[in-house]
């Protein structure tokens, strides 16, 4: 089965072709970072208009790279939510038009389910069950994953997500957009321990997160350093990243201990952070836990993860198109709420 995946939830237009026997055949991505940089963040109307311009040329690109035609497509998966409503509607509209024209099934995919399953695109994919640390944009969650569509929420952020804290800290430090990678790069030059920042909810006794207080602590430090030199900024960035990593690592391994699972999957944009990967790998080696990550190319939003998630859903429930969530979009959508028809 050849599945076309379409991702358009925010500021990346991603398309991919995934074959259930041969694996990922091709993928293409256009990022809008340069367009939004002058505004310091994503402008929804501009994002939607750019998706419209990019989606069909990218479709032709993935078909050409895979040596396939539109007639070869057996099913279409698109990001149904969560995300920006206008941006989501672009992908959903293209999926609908192609689906009806080709008379093939369509399936709406949860954006975070795509991230959660993205490590399965690697050469050594993790088997079920596992614990997933999802750190993507406005989401920071710990999920117990027993199989496709079988997800239990163990913990989540009570205020700012880790990605949001990165972006806000970048602004406080006078860094560019997007903030996360800029903070991580600056932190590489920082001295560990130069600043003492809090580890919110580190000893809360549950698996929830909170990063608003950490952001406030960074704000307090920047105000104390009115004439901040470059090394001070690097040291503060390092202290911030270390605090985030400490909390994410501690909560992840607490979830593993609580459930008894021996596999940890890390997905989403922050999952590309080098310091986080090093800490989790170190703890995994010490505690005999296997840690899995997506390829760096698939940490950001992409069509490959949507094609894979759609293919896995259609394989698990062949009549899914008849039991679909509908062909609209769901800008607000909890991952723990989705189920396969047989599990509903």
From Swiss-Prot:
Amino acids binding substrate: 134-138, 167, 180, 273
Key word Plastid present: no
CDD domains named among the record's database cross-references: ASKHA_NBD_TsaD_bac
GO CC terms: cytoplasm
Catalyzed reactions: L-threonylcarbamoyladenylate + adenosine(37) in tRNA = N(6)-L-threonylcarbamoyladenosine(37) in tRNA + AMP + H(+)
Cofactor binding annotation: Binds 1 Fe(2+) ion per subunit.
Keyword presence, rRNA-binding: no
Coiled coil feature spans: none
Gene Ontology terms for molecular function: iron ion binding; N(6)-L-threonylcarbamoyladenine synthase activity
Cofactors: Fe(2+)
UniProt cross-references to Pfam families, sorted A to Z: TsaD
Protein EC: 2.3.1.234
Keywords assigned by UniProt, alphabetized: Acyltransferase, Cytoplasm, Iron, Metal-binding, Transferase, tRNA processing
Residues bound to Fe cation: 111, 115, 301
Compartments in which it is found: Cytoplasm
Record-level GO BP terms: tRNA threonylcarbamoyladenosine modification
Assigned protein family: Belongs to the KAE1 / TsaD family.
Physiological role: Required for the formation of a threonylcarbamoyl group on adenosine at position 37 (t(6)A37) in tRNAs that read codons beginning with adenine. Is involved in the transfer of the threonylcarbamoyl moiety of threonylcarbamoyl-AMP (TC-AMP) to the N6 group of A37, together with TsaE and TsaB. TsaD likely plays a direct catalytic role in this reaction.
Protein name, entry field: tRNA N6-adenosine threonylcarbamoyltransferase
The organism of origin for this protein: Cupriavidus pinatubonensis (strain JMP 134 / LMG 1197)
Classification lineage: Bacteria, Pseudomonadati, Pseudomonadota, Betaproteobacteria, Burkholderiales
Gene that this sequence comes from: tsaD
């Amino acid at each position: 089965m050849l599945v076309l995946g379409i991702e358009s939830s925010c500021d990346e237009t991603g398309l991919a072709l995934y074959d259930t026997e041969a694996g990922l055949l091709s993928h293409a991505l256009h990022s809008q970072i340069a367009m939004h940089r002058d505004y310091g963040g994503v402008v929804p109307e501009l994002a939607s208009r750019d998706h419209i311009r990019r989606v069909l040329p990218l479709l032709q690109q993935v078909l050409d790279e895979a040596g396939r035609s539109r007639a070869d497509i057996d099913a279409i998966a698109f990001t149904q939510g969560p995300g920006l409503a206008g941006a989501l509607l672009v992908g959903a509209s293209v999926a609908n038009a192609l689906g009806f024209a080709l008379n093939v099934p369509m399936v709406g995919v949860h954006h975070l389910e795509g991230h959660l399953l993205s490590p399965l695109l690697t050469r050594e994919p993790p088997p079920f069950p596992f614990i997933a640390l999802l750190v993507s944009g406005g989401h920071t969650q710990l999920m117990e994953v027993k199989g496709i569509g079988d997800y239990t929420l163990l913990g989540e952020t009570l205020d700012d997500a880790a990605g949001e804290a990165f972006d806000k800290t970048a602004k406080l430090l006078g860094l560019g957009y997007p903030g996360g990678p800029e903070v991580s790069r600056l932190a590489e030059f920082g001295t560990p321990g130069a600043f003492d920042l809090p580890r919110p909810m580190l000893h809360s006794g549950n698996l929830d997160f909170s990063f608003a207080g950490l952001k406030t602590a960074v704000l307090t430090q920047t105000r104390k350093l009115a004439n901040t030199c470059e090394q001070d900024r690097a040291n503060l960035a390092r202290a911030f990243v270390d605090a985030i990593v400490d909390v994410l690592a501690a909560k992840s391994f607490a979830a593993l201990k609580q459930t008894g699972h021996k596999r940890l999957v890390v997905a989403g944009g922050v999952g590309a952070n080098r310091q986080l990967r090093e800490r989790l790998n170190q703890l995994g080696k010490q505690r005999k836990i296997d840690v899995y990550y997506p390829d760096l190319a698939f940490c950001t939003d992409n069509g490959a993860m949507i094609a894979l998630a759609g293919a896995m859903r259609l394989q698990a429930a062949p009549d899914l198109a008849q039991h679909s969530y509908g062909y609209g979009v769901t800008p607000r959508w909890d991952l723990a709420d989705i189920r396969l028809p047989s599990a509903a």
